[in-house]
Amino acid sequence: MTNIVVLIKQVPDTWSERKLTDGDFTLDREAADAVLDEINERAVEEALQIREKEAADGIEGSVTVLTAGPERATEAIRKALSMGADKAVHLKDDGMHGSDVIQTGWALARALGTIEGTELVIAGNESTDGVGGAVPAIIAEYLGLPQLTHLRKVSIEGGKITGERETDEGVFTLEATLPAVISVNEKINEPRFPSFKGIMAAKKKEVTVLTLAEIGVESDEVGLANAGSTVLASTPKPAKTAGEKVTDEGEGGNQIVQYLVAQKII
């Protein structure tokens, strides 16, 4: 039996305009459309494929999704449940606002401790809002579990998990004994679309809501005021302007060189 927990995150849609709040420079999550991060959809898909493969062999398992976020994150949870996840855990506490990656990893590790029988934790390699790529490794460190990160292929057999990681140097095969933490990249699979039946079923699936107190995390261990880093200032990205057009009437090459020199590119 493989009981899998998938870490998911609701993020601003990459097609929406993303803004920082004026006061503390944290991401203004209400200013943009919110979606389940695409890499998390792939993580959920991988968990479902593992569960389905084992079910075909007569092995029972479950898939639980875990997220930390405000009330709005329920939308991401329902998307994962409609894909086929069995249940969800939602860490919802205002004290998490502004937490850095270390604090977030700590809180998620504590929340994982409330889910019994977890043998595998699957995460995306990095979120599209923070792009830190550190949370899976941080959680593995806190839990004292082996970690296999940035995987493009995964298989489980005999209480061991094997994965492939592709780098500029080549493709490496990694192996660990369960329980373990893994992260997957965009090459791992193509996520399924929720069916109408799945969408309706998701409304009835169990969602456990937890607070920081319920997972044994003190208020001074998380949050903006206790973060290990502070953003002191933020400057909006300049609006795009039309580029300089060069009409080649025999001097095009010289004009391009002059432009590059003026821009201190060459």
From Swiss-Prot:
Task: Give the matching SUPFAM superfamilies.
Answer: Adenine nucleotide alpha hydrolases-like
The gene behind this protein is etfB
Q: Which cofactor does it need?
A: FAD; AMP
Q: What does this protein do?
A: The electron transfer flavoprotein serves as a specific electron acceptor for other dehydrogenases. It transfers the electrons to the main respiratory chain via ETF-ubiquinone oxidoreductase (ETF dehydrogenase).
- A cellular component term (GO) from this record? peptidoglycan-based cell wall
- Name one molecular function that GO assigns to this entry: electron transfer activity
InterPro entries in the cross-refs: ET-Flavoprotein_bsu_CS, ETF_a/b_N, ETF_b, ETF_beta_N, Rossmann-like_a/b/a_fold
What SMART domains does the record tag this protein with? ETF
Subunit text: Heterodimer of an alpha and a beta subunit.
Taxon lineage: Bacteria, Bacillati, Actinomycetota, Actinomycetes, Mycobacteriales
Record text on cofactor binding: Binds 1 FAD per dimer.
Q: Which family does it belong to?
A: Belongs to the ETF beta-subunit/FixA family.
State the name under which the record lists this protein. Answer: Electron transfer flavoprotein subunit beta
Q: Which CDD domains match?
A: ETF_beta
Judging by the UniProt lineage, the source's domain of life is Bacteria
Alphabetically sorted, this entry's keywords are:
Electron transport, FAD, Flavoprotein, Transport
PROSITE patterns cross-referenced by the UniProt entry: ETF_BETA
